[in-house]
């Protein structure tokens, strides 16, 4: 097990939490997870990566990570029997090794793409030359995001390390006719369709205007959505 860097979070007061009843209800489900798959225009993202001579994979990965961090509900977990909300999420992504296996790589969040790529690139390069292996970390302050570049799929059900896991799982597929499918698994105890839709809206914004991924996020630019999008 790899010990991840210390993550900062706040404890949610469930006594006054507007979501308390929904949280309690969905936590009783045998499996409270739900999956979505949304086609998203990505031609501009591809062309931007090509023009700037950066990794299309890394640019898409960062856009997904930035969108996930922009929706508070995707940062909420249970820790020591308390509901918490992490300040920031990292991303764990599989990288193909020489033997066509894969090794998981941990990539920390960053305020803009250049910093993200500078930290992620050496890890990705090193992973390609190592033996296949999973990555088990202590903590849940991350999302899982995988690229499936060989398929342009229309649906996907993600594997779960534990039934009803709170860590969101994302997969994006092959660019076809300017569109990429982005599938996501979310825990209904924290995330409703509304919150998932806000996540996808942020993904669309990043894919449609990728130049913004080089601009550091400020508090006012945390989300392009109305203030209600940031309600707890």
What are these regions (language model features)?
Residues 4-37, 57, 140-173, 214-216:
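Flexible, Gly/Pro-enriched loop and linker segments at secondary-structure and domain junctions
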Residues 5-9, 26-59, 75-89, 168, ...:
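Gly/Ser/Thr-rich phosphate-binding loops and adjoining beta-strand/alpha-helix segments
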Residues 45-70, 180-199:
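Acyl activation and transfer enzymes in specialized metabolism, enriched
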Residues 74-106, 132-135, 218-225:
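Small-residue-rich loop/turn and linker elements
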Residues 96, 123-128, 132-135, 171, ...:
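Plant-skewed but cross-kingdom recognition/interaction modules and surfaces
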Residues 97-153:
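Helical lid/core segments from catalytic subdomains that handle acyl or acyl-like groups
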Residues 154-191, 196-204:
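Intrinsically disordered, low-complexity linker/assembly segments
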Residues 205-225:
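Flexible helix-coil linker/hinge segments at domain or subdomain boundaries
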């Amino acid at each position: 097990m790899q010990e991840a860097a210390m993550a900062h979070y706040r404890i949610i007061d469930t006594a006054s939490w507007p979501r308390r009843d929904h949280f309690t209800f969905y936590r009783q489900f045998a499996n409270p997870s739900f999956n979505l798959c949304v086609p998203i225009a990505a031609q501009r993202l591809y062309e931007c990566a090509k023009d700037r001579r950066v990794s299309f994979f890394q640019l898409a990965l960062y856009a997904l990570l930035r969108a996930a961090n922009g929706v508070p509900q995707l940062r909420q977990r249970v820790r020591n029997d308390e509901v918490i909300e992490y300040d920031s999420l990292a991303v764990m992504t599989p990288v193909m090794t020489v033997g066509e296996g894969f090794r998981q790589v941990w990539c920390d969040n960053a305020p803009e793409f250049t910093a993200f790529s500078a930290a992620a690139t050496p890890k990705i390069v090193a992973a390609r030359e190592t033996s296949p292996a999973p990555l088990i970390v202590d903590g849940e302050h991350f999302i899982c995001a995988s690229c499936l570049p060989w398929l342009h799929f229309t649906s996907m059900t993600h594997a779960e390390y534990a039934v009803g896991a709170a860590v969101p799982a994302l997969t994006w597929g092959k660019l076809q006719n300017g569109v990429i499918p982005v599938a996501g698994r979310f825990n209904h105890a924290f995330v409703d369709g509304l919150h998932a839709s806000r996540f996808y809206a942020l993904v669309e914004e990043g894919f449609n205007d990728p130049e913004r991924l080089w601009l550091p996020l400020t508090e006012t630019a945390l989300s392009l959505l109305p203030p209600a999008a940031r309600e707890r």
